Amino acid sequence: MKLKKPVFLYFLLLAGLAASATEYQNTNTDQFPLRIHPNGKHVTDNNGKPFLMVTDVAWQLLRKLTYADVVQYMDIRKSQSFNTFVLQLLPALPNQKNVNKIAPFQDNDINKPNAAYFDYLEKIVIAAKERDLVIGIVVSRKSWNVVFDSKKEDDWKNYGRFVGKRFAKYPNIIWIVSEEEYQSASQFSAIAEGLRISTENNNLVASLSTCSPSNLAHNAANRSDLKFVIPDSTVTFGEYETLTNWQKNSGQLSQQPFLISNSEFPKEITDQSALIRNQAYQSIMSSAAGFCHMSTIKNFYPTWKVNITKDGAEYIHHFVKILKGIPWEYMYPNHTPGLLPDSTDQRQIGTVSLTNNRLSMLYIPESKPVLLDLTKLRGNDFQIVWYSPRTGRRWTGASITSSTGALITPPDAQTGWDWILLVGARE
């Protein structure tokens, strides 16, 4: 039997979150700019409503897509429940131009921006705002080091100030500064400062890493509001392993919101749909602010219009639908040690719980029975609810009594299916 809406509210009432559930239903078009949640782990809209960031990587959008294609891309991703996309402001190489054959600077001098280049970006920002989409704009990149390194701190700051002022009136922008490409933090700090002092809306300023972030403290030299971790084609298998381990511990390590993209080595995988779906839920299990989806669409090859409906994004709508019924923003990883007695399950299954230990959510990457020690949760009687990330369907499971060996079985034994399991105290 499908879980009805009152059961959603039942779980929320148990958790003392009824007010939050009511707030979650409110709609307000004045949702930008985004803010940092008081818990320091997540993002909210401008009204304080939790904002699950569902982000698509669109690195080469400026270089490859005409305006008509940009609009088509946005409309497709919007229909798939994405609310954010990120792009590179600068072309991949200093000798390249945007789709209109315009370079960002005259003579590659960052003090001499080409107005037409930024005019085209503005059209895209406006189109995104009209669709209630957040646009993350990466303003610096490793391949441009030869250009930026020839300048001084004042030049970097002026560049950040110019870009920030040029788009100051648009609250749907998140500025992103690449933080790992430099031997020192000076360029990051100067560009970020220029962006911060020129914005009218206090837009978030984020940082971008392609590997595990090395410093997550609030007082780090590269101070940012939000961290994006998006591997690129140069990341090695070993670095992916390090990134995966970092993600498993990031709920404790990170002191600010973060989004992580595909943290498993994908080069030998033809169909990445299952991997991407797995990564989306593992991100939430790591206490991320959402999920950053990355596929070959980021390069906008000639086949992108065909592939955009089958690149793993077909499951994102279910991802958003499922999480809207769960107080994910109040749940934290590793809060109920011992809930999974089996050591293999501990390695494979992601778990988050409310701090009062009355509700836990588990992501089970394969269809199999799961052994739970319910004495690690608060309560005597528990309600089970299942969700299928593959189909979006939900089931009401059994009511069970607390015990050290509760064996919970998925409602449909489909080979290769993954599952979301909710376990909530009834009393």
Residue ranges and their predicted role:
Residues 21-80, 358, 372, 377-396, ...:
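Non-catalytic accessory regions flanking glycosidase/transglycosidase catalytic cores in CAZymes
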Residues 12-20:
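Hydrophobic h-region of N-terminal signal peptides that target proteins for export
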Residues 172, 178-311:
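Extracellular glycoside hydrolase catalytic/binding regions
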Residues 24-238:
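Active-site mouth of glycoside hydrolases
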Residues 1-9:
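Bacterial N-terminal signal peptides that target proteins for export
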Residues 26, 266-267, 272-398, 409-427:
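Aromatic- and carboxylate-lined catalytic core of secreted/periplasmic carbohydrate-active enzymes
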Residues 8-11, 278:
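Sec-dependent N-terminal signal peptides
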